[in-house]
Swiss-Prot record:
GO terms for molecular function: structural constituent of ribosome. Keywords: Ribonucleoprotein, Ribosomal protein. It comes from Mycoplasma mobile (strain ATCC 43663 / 163K / NCTC 11711). GO terms for biological process: translation. The keyword Translocase does not apply. Residues 56-65 have a biased composition (Basic and acidic residues). NCBIfam families: rpmI_bact. InterPro entries: Ribosomal_bL35, Ribosomal_bL35-like, Ribosomal_bL35_sf. This is Large ribosomal subunit protein bL35. HAMAP family: Ribosomal_bL35. Residues 30-65 are annotated as: Disordered. One of its GO terms (cellular component) is ribonucleoprotein complex. The keyword Ribonucleoprotein applies.
Amino acid sequence: MMAKNKMKPKKALAKRIKISSTGKVKFGHAFRSHLAQNKSTKQKRQSKHGTFMHPTDYKRLKDLM
């Protein structure tokens, strides 16, 4: 009898998120790599820091991880 195959995590997603000790998902903001002169100071400042994903999006991540 054959063993079940393990589900592998999507490496693209695994490289972009971190799971905190409390189980929250942290990710970085997009639109920071170039063309910064066209973006407002507020947009650049607020995208410096990572943010936590909303819990309603966890269901989508579960299949990918």
